[in-house]
Structure formats: C-alpha cells, structure tokens
C-alpha cells in the first residue's frame, strides 16, 4: 500500500465471490456490502458501538456498518455484564450493538434478516487510513483487560499480512468455521478481517461443544478451515466425533503440543498451523506444530531481542510493541518461544518455567485439561487443578515425578470436573486462584478429608 494513499477499500474481494455463510445460506460480497451500507445509515448517532452480537455474521455486518458510518467498535474481553459495564463507563458515548440488553445503555439490533432483500451493491466503500475503527481489549489473563486502539491502516495492512502468512498457495475458497468469539483479537483477525481480503467464506455460527463443532464443519463444503484453540480442539479430538476432512486447522491463544497437533492431523486429515501473536500486535508468526519447533515470522514484522525484553516492529503498527514473552532468535525470520515473561517461578532456589511445567502436565495420557500455578507470591509450593476423570491426585503426582524436579511438583493437586476457561480457551489467573481457594477452604472444613483427592 503506497504511503501517500489516504484510504483503502473495505474489501478487495470480487463482488460475486461468497464472503459468508449466513442463517439463510451463502452471502456474496455485493449482497454483504449493500446490507452493511444500509445498516450504517440506521445506526444510532454515537461514537462507539459495543458489538456483542452472538451470531458471527451479525457481528461481521455490524462491524463493517460501524466502519462505514465512521464509528469505532468496542470489543470487550468477554460478554459478562460487569466487563461490558466497565467498558461502557470508560467510553460513555456508546451503545450496544447486537442481542444483549443492559440497563442504562441504548441497544440497537443488527436484524440482518430484514436487510436480506436489499439490492446488491456495485460500490465498494473506501475508509480513511487514519480512522479509528476498533478498540480491542486484552483477555485479562495476566491482569485487568487493557484497551488497544486499531486504526484502519493497522487493520487492513495486518489483514494483508495475515493473508500472505496463512493462505499460502491457497487458490480455492476456504469455508471457515471459528470456535473463538469475534470480539477476541484472534477471532477478529481470522473470521472478520481475513475474509475481506482473502478467499474465505465464514460461517455465522460459533459452536462450543465438540458434537456441535463437528456438525457445523460437516455442513460446510470442502475445503474447510477451523479457527480454534488448543482447549477446543483437544476436547473435539477426545470426544471421538465423526471424522470430517479439515483442510486447515488454525490454532492460537495458548501453546499446542506437537503430540496434539500430530493427532489432529491424522484424525482429520488436516494441516495444523499454530499462530503466534498478541492483542497489541496481532498475528505475527506461524509454525506447522506437528513437525516444526521454530516460529516463522511474517514478512511485515521484525523482532529486536535484548536487555531483557523483546520489541515487535511493523510499518502498520503505530508504535513498537513490547512482547510479554521470552523469545530467542534462531535464523532469518525465525525464533524459538521460551515462555511468558511472567511465567518464571523460583522454588527452593531453583528457577522454572510454568509453561514448561504445564506442557509436561498436559502430556500425561490421562489428563484432559489442567493448570500448574503459583497460588500467591509468597507460596513456597506450586499447585495444580487437573481434569482427569477416574484418576486420583496421587496418580497424577506419580505420573509427573519422572519428568519434573521434586521442587516443582505441584502440591496440592485438586481433581476438578472442568476448568473455568473463557470462550477463547484462556484461563485468567484471577479465576484460577479463586477456584483453588474455594476448593481449599471446602477441604479444610471437612472433618474427614479424603486422601484420594489431595496430595501433600
């Protein structure tokens, strides 16, 4: 994109191409644009739109309509009332866009069904590059969610970078299903922005349960693509659903093991592509996890590693971004991920990585889900919450001993039915500690505490 250019079209797709699978079938680019323009003329006169639409097509349409109307879309880290209210308090000139109502905040329904009869458009809107189009909030996994402003220049050039990184040699249209919400940066980039500049038709549904994911995939024609997270695809694999060929599985939000990637590739006849990125910078690298340990950086990005920190640079980013990760450069445009900056722990004078410990926990054959963590800064021992049906905490401890030093063995280990993951599959520290303390207090109150559920 020439630096002198002041605007960029909202999509580079052909008008006759299919861009979405809506509730009533395929939607062409021409139909989509006409509906977005019509919706833009109906939106309330506010600066900010909090887009909480549960239907991905409604979110897509609402976002593009807001962009055309010159409004900025706010994307909370989740749809919980307290989170949304905090965003509304911080950005007062706002309204709710979608199917969620809250007292004291104006709501506008996308109502995409009423727009279905509008005559397809032949005009493609141009958007000023300096226009503030979205504010995306971090997941809050390491603290309070923070806002990140996204200008049109950042979004469109990021989408073009992602197209080059993710759609390598892809000529046929991909029919894409996403299990992560569009309000999250990972879901936003792949299921909302990428279809505007790549041969992708995105499904309107956001399935959560394994059977629903499998059925939604089967309803799409080949070639299919799945945008998901390790937690979601692991559950999908473990549910023994009917096999359906998936051309590409794109995964992000948490590290994926090579073992899981290999199992997914074999079961679904797929290629698993893991994505590295963050809310602040977006998608910046990829790897074929089943066969590669190094990350391949996108052409648009560069890394500067030194003095205990890593800076990310790209021409479409308004400023350098400091990664909350530790990386090691390993050749041209390649790097090795060493863990989160905050995941190093010191136990009994020894330093260890929580990311590595959790990788070893998740590698156990009987563990469906789990997390090893430090309950608080003063703790002298790690703890773990583990989903392992039919297993006892002592069994998990014995299985961990061959691969983890004694100082880093988690004690206590609590067996739980499930972990309180966000829609993206992430776990926030606040929720983990809250669940841990709730279980610990309940155990402490039991007169006859069962040794099978806890290890000391």
List where the protein language model places each region.
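Gly/Ser/Thr-rich phosphate-binding loop
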Residues: 237-292, 302
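AMP-binding/adenylate-forming catalytic core of the ANL superfamily
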Residues: 324-408
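Conserved AMP-binding A3 loop
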Residues: 26-28, 125, 133-160
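Conserved AMP-binding/adenylate-forming
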Residues: 38-79, 173-182
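Conserved AMP-binding/adenylation subdomain of ANL enzymes
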Residues: 157-175, 183-225
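Conserved AMP-binding/adenylate-forming core of the ANL superfamily
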Residues: 13-44, 150-153
């Amino acid at each position: 994109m020439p630096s002198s250019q002041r605007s960029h079209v909202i999509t580079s797709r052909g008008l006759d191409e299919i861009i979405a699978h809506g509730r009533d079938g395929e939607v062409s680019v021409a139909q989509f644009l006409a509906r977005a323009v019509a919706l833009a003329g109906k939106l309330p006169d506010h600066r900010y739109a909090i887009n909480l639409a549960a239907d991905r097509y409604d979110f897509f349409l609402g976002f593009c309509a807001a962009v055309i109307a010159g409004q900025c879309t706010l994307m909370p880290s989740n749809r919980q009332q307290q989170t949304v209210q905090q965003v509304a308090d911080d950005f007062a000139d706002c309204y709710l866009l979608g199917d969620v109502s809250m007292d004291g905040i104006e709501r506008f329904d996308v109502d995409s069904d009423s727009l279905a009869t509008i005559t397809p458009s032949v005009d493609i809107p141009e958007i000023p590059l300096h226009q503030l189009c979205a504010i995306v909030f971090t997941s809050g996994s390491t603290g309070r969610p923070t806002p990140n402003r996204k200008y049109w220049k950042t979004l469109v050039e990021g989408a073009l970078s992602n197209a080059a990184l993710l759609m390598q040699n892809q000529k046929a249209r991909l029919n894409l299903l996403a299990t992560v919400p569009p309000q999250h940066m990972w879901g936003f980039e792949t299921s909302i922005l990428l279809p505007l500049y790549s041969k992708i038709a995105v499904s309107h549904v956001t399935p959560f349960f394994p059977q629903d994911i499998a059925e939604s995939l089967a309803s799409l024609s080949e070639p299919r693509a799945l945008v998901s997270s390790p937690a979601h695809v692991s559950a999908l694999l473990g549910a023994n659903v009917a096999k359906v060929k998936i051309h590409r599985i794109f995964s992000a939000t948490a590290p994926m093991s090579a073992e899981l990637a290999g199992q997914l590739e074999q079961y679904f006849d797929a290629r698993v592509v893991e994505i590295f990125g963050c809310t602040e910078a977006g998608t910046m690298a990829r790897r074929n996890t089943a066969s590669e340990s190094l990350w391949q950086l996108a052409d648009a990005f560069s890394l500067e590693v030194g003095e205990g920190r890593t800076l990310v640079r790209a021409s479409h980013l308004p400023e350098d971004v400091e990664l909350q990760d530790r990386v090691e450069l390993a050749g041209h445009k390649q790097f090795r991920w060493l863990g989160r900056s905050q995941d190093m722990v010191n136990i009994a004078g020894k330093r260890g990585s929580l990311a590595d410990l959790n990788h070893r926990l998740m590698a156990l054959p009987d563990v469906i889900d789990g997390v090893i963590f430090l309950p608080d800064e003063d703790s002298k021992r790690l703890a773990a919450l583990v989903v392992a049906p039919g297993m006892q905490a002592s069994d998990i401890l014995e299985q961990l001993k061959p691969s983890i030093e004694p100082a880093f063995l988690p004690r206590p280990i609590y067996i739980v039915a499930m972990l309180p993951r966000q829609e993206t599959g992430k776990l926030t520290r606040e929720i983990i500690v809250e669940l841990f303390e709730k279980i610990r207090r309940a155990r402490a109150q039991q007169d006859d505490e069962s040794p099978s559920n806890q290890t000391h």
